[in-house]
Amino acid sequence: MSSPASTPSRRGSRRGRATPAQTPRSEDARSSPSQRRRGEDSTSTGELQPMPTSPGVDLQSPAAQDVLFSSPPQMHSSAIPLDFDVSSPLTYGTPSSRVEGTPRSGVRGTPVRQRPDLGSAQKGLQVDLQSDGAAAEDIVASEQSLGQKLVIWGTDVNVAACKENFQRFLQRFIDPLAKEEENVGIDITEPLYMQRLGEINVIGEPFLNVNCEHIKSFDKNLYRQLISYPQEVIPTFDMAVNEIFFDRYPDSILEHQIQVRPFNALKTKNMRNLNPEDIDQLITISGMVIRTSQLIPEMQEAFFQCQVCAHTTRVEMDRGRIAEPSVCGRCHTTHSMALIHNRSLFSDKQMIKLQESPEDMPAGQTPHTVILFAHNDLVDKVQPGDRVNVTGIYRAVPIRVNPRVSNVKSVYKTHIDVIHYRKTDAKRLHGLDEEAEQKLFSEKRVELLKELSRKPDIYERLASALAPSIYEHEDIKKGILLQLFGGTRKDFSHTGRGKFRAEINILLCGDPGTSKSQLLQYVYNLVPRGQYTSGKGSSAVGLTAYVMKDPETRQLVLQTGALVLSDNGICCIDEFDKMNESTRSVLHEVMEQQTLSIAKAGIICQLNARTSVLAAANPIESQWNPKKTTIENIQLPHTLLSRFDLIFLLLDPQDEAYDRRLAHHLVALYYQSEEQAEEELLDMAVLKDYIAYAHSTIMPRLSEEASQALIEAYVDMRKIGSSRGMVSAYPRQLESLIRLAEAHAKVRLSNKVEAIDVEEAKRLHREALKQSATDPRTGIVDISILTTGMSATSRKRKEELAEALKKLILSKGKTPALKYQQLFEDIRGQSDIAITKDMFEEALRALADDDFLTVTGKTVRLL
């Protein structure tokens, strides 16, 4: 028997020769892979060899390298094998490899499932550190003692000790900081993870999410091993939890063995600080998903067949590579093995691009991105626009200089293999992970919210909790509050009537310095899927989507913009008036149809953009001109303005009493006491929970009484204008009233829209129209200002001027041509009102449209 310091020889008997790391497994045997593996191990009559760890060995020699990267030494034929074999990723997580069943099955038919998120564990050799060259029979005498000595090569992970420590953690850990609101249905005085295993038995989802902070507080050494060697430790955790589970629930049959998913690693880093020391370690980073790829099938196990003798072999993937057998194991023919695709094993894979969150970005820096790879059931768990905390293993992959040459570049390409997603953001409305989706609120919290909804002034309370640092503007805050709640989405496409949007769009316009941008920022920081853009800094493709070449597949793919990323959220657009025409034109379809049609570079599709738009615009003269209409002040097309449900004006009143109250409020913000700040935080927490609960559970429908009230309100609005020849309401205004009434019913946590909701919707809509759709000449509300860009009074005056000009030209007799300036002075002399040059040119254009005259230069010719 060779000593530990001796260099093993490549020649000699089978007992002393190391087995290659990726030994193909023959399909000829009728036993399961784990049974075949034990049979191969038991065929050797050699002794257990210790790994050469002495400094006297030349580690650079080929013989030493052969040992360092070889399979574990083989045992005596009479040896009883261990309960687990770390060298194969297909067997870890199986409570006992001796259990009879189908090939690759666990306990009572629960199959074993490979974990591509961890990669292959074949390089994790089993090493007996305490062996001193004794006979194998002495080791076989105590299987228990052999298990205690098993350590994974290259680490300090003692498999038996690690497994025992994790089992003790599962059976004993009680979270001292647990709150009932966060652990609905969990007894916080009992071991937390044993109750989670009970849930797995009931629900049947074979995934156990383990908080790394809990492991650290229970066993710091176990936590250190998990962070440093996740690829080796997590399979050991899988084995431990499966043994406990199937001992506790022997009759349970799961889809596959339970997989442990650690999250909340305290080694949380900003993605721009990731460096080589993090490679192959467990990390947690946060960011926003900006792109997800299509599903990619990834081969996990290749099936090869000899073209000469039909001998078959399976080869497992090892760190993204599959070693094709060069020689047939039966007939020894070289290069005769062919890959059989339909017998190979594949797993789902998805590439995700994660971008740094704006709040984590240093000043003056552009956002960093990192590539994630999700596997199996984690595919399609997140969508573009989601803010997530990702726990995974940081990988570095070499890049070949040439695909045909094995030489690689010195710079490696990095990515993260995802182990756990957690959708969360503490500042926003509600952060959910997969455990909390179904049980967001405890019964006590729901009862508190329902009790709050019964208060008669709940509407005013919630509005005052919204942006408390901004003075007054109560109606504007109420409008934004209703926008946060939203209406009820209705889909009648199966009857041919299409879909009706539930999102409410609001435009804030007025003087500079009236808190418009602050309101937008407040809403952006509150909603879970919000996007914030500025008019000048946004392009049409930045809002919609643009085509780029995928660096992985080299194919053209669609990269989504702000409107698509804020699907089911709110898109805040500041400096709305400064957007160019091509950028604003893309909003027409989004604001009404809630979709985005794309036809670029051969990619034709329709994306969902079910987003509410909250926009802010300044007047073109830097100050609001009360003598002009809204459209004349902000120079926005009427086709776009008509799509806003509410248009509010924020004007500077220039009143001394108001200025004094405002200054007192602003100064008070600077010496706010801790009690006041804490009270505001409590109000914010209640507001978040209230809106989240209403969103997820309340879907109000119109009652008969509310339907009649809406009909009467619409008819009354039409009557107001018809008496003066004006249009004061269109069907879009009726739809806006319905959405506002539904949102107000959600504020009351009512599933039925009552007349009181319609009354508030009418009042708020009327207040907004008073400000934005009032004709400055007459002081009367005229909705046609927003829908056609011109009030009825202006239209009537334009028609009268054109008629007067026509009479003036006819009174001059049959004159073939008239001078432009002379005609302008004549009409000004006859008119009682001041006629500007623009009004005169509009009248000429109206007559030209009627084929009465034509204007050539400075000459007017009759037709």
From Swiss-Prot:
Organism annotation: Homo sapiens
InterPro entries: MCM, MCM_4, MCM_CS, MCM_dom, MCM_lid, MCM_N, MCM_OB, NA-bd_OB-fold
Binding site for ATP 2: 471, 516-517, 618
Record PTM text: Sumoylated; SUMO2 modified in response to stress caused by inhibition of proteasome activity (in vitro).
Binding site for ATP 1: 497, 643, 732, 735
Lineage: Eukaryota, Metazoa, Chordata, Craniata, Vertebrata
Low complexity biased stretches: 1-10
Record text on subunit structure and interactions: Component of the MCM2-7 complex. The complex forms a toroidal hexameric ring with the proposed subunit order MCM2-MCM6-MCM4-MCM7-MCM3-MCM5. Component of the CMG helicase complex, a hexameric ring of related MCM2-7 subunits stabilized by CDC45 and the tetrameric GINS complex. Interacts with MCMBP.
Catalytic activity: ATP + H2O = ADP + phosphate + H(+)
Protein name: DNA replication licensing factor MCM4
Other known facts: Early fractionation of eukaryotic MCM proteins yielded a variety of dimeric, trimeric and tetrameric complexes with unclear biological significance. Specifically a MCM467 subcomplex is shown to have in vitro helicase activity which is inhibited by the MCM2 subunit. The MCM2-7 hexamer is the proposed physiological active complex.
GO biological process: DNA replication; DNA strand elongation involved in DNA replication; double-strand break repair via break-induced replication; mitotic DNA replication initiation; regulation of DNA-templated DNA replication initiation
